Amino acid sequence: MRYLARTLFALLLVCQPGWALSSEMTRSDKALWLNVGAGALALGWGTWSWDWGAAGPRFQDEGWFGRTTGEGGADKLGHAWSGYALSHLFAYSYERFGYGRSDAARYGAYSSLGVMTAIEIGDAFSDEYGFSYQDMLFNAAGAALGYVLWEYPEINRKIDFRAEYDPFPRGKRQLDVTTDYQRLKYLIAVKADGFEEVTNPLLRYLELHVGYYARNYESYSGPGSSDRRERNVFIGVGLNVTKLLSPYVDTGGVFNYVQVPYTSINLDRNLDRR
């Protein structure tokens, strides 16, 4: 549940500034209190729900994208996506506070990395987790990508970093969908609608997808058990759901971060097929 909790408190803190922070406060004060609130809530929630303080500080080498890692690397992309999405939530708030686009992009990345780092440090004092430098690298990579795409809207119009959750595959289900890697995919979407060179109105509804996912890690219990673990890469063509729905509803940009399942045709390659 820890990643779901992180996402919820991030949304609560970052989306509420318009009404929760007094209009009489300076933008610097609003930014300060937003970050103090995020840090305090992370500390309180982590101590209560994630057993921070139950053990002494320790590091944990989780590996990268190897087949024998805990999640085949899908969790690393989950960290990157969290850092990316959180940086944009913060940047959105900073613009509402009165910061210009460049400052909002920079401070959004800093705040995202700060929150994610605080959580990782808290994990170092947990019996279950531990500080992972691999996680930290992908936290930073996600925040950096968030900075680039917010700072440069001409790139943002062309590229999205998305997570896709498909509830239908078989296997053990988790209440926390953000760590249910049996049903998650991560992808980069290149949107035809962002390129002026694409003039055909129908082609502008299409996207190129490149992504990664892992499967069957939750059912593997160790040596001697059935081992169906697999890591997959894919390339595909998808529909721009935001553009499709824009004449009818304002999606608020949510589909720039979340990929709707079954709206693309993919060619998959299993990296572990013998």
Where in the sequence are the language-model features?
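Hydrophobic alpha-helical membrane segments
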Residues: L21-R274
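Cleavable N-terminal export/targeting peptides
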Residues: M1-M25, R274
